[in-house]
Amino acid sequence: MKRATTLAVAGTLLLAALATPLPALAADPAPTLKPMLGVYLGRATVKDLDTQATEERDIDVEVTPFDRDGFRIRWVNVTLVDGRRNLPGVKRRVSELTFKPAKGRNFFVEVPQANVFAEREEVQPLGGDPVRWAVQDAAGLHVHSFVILGDGRYELQTYSRKRTDSGIVLHYERVVDGKLVRTIDGQAVKVE
């Protein structure tokens, strides 16, 4: 009789476990990230503060969930020639970064790109590898990249994206050894 009771209890627990809703296996980012998720298309102006040269870029930004509470950001920059993208000299650059929450902290850290054919290597900041992190706050989503340059100077890049009613406003700054050398400002609409 004890064996039958044990089996009955085990069966009941198994059924209860199967009937209990499980957390979604698909990505479910932190609630504060949800307004930022989406695909955005727009244009930005790049300004070199040393030369005062400017250039126009078409921008394509995609923010998607990663794992349970992280995010992936992918962006495409198309540097235009005379405001057009169908002329010789146009440049296209694609970048992608993935972030997950830092344990016990209120920011995100970069997740290294997976490569099944290579051994995982640790980030080497003194070897020139960038250290990247992201912060979500009331002003938007900010991605920071810090690099120690070969000559001992440093570079800090900050790319901020702020949600608007129709999309996002973008602002980028590149600082080398304390001096602001480049900015990018633009707007992008959310694609339905």
Protein language model features and the residues they cover:
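Edge beta-strand at a domain terminus
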Residues: 154-192
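Residue-level recognition of well-ordered beta-strand positions that form the cores
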Residues: 41-45, 76, 144-146, 162, ...
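C-terminal segment of classical bacterial N-terminal signal peptides
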Residues: 15-24
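N-terminal helix-cap/turn-to-beta initiation motif at the start of protein domains
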Residues: 25-41, 135-136
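Central antiparallel beta-sheet cores of small beta-barrel/beta-sandwich binding domains
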Residues: 46-149, 154-157, 187-192
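One face of beta-strands
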Residues: 38-44, 57-59, 168-170, 184
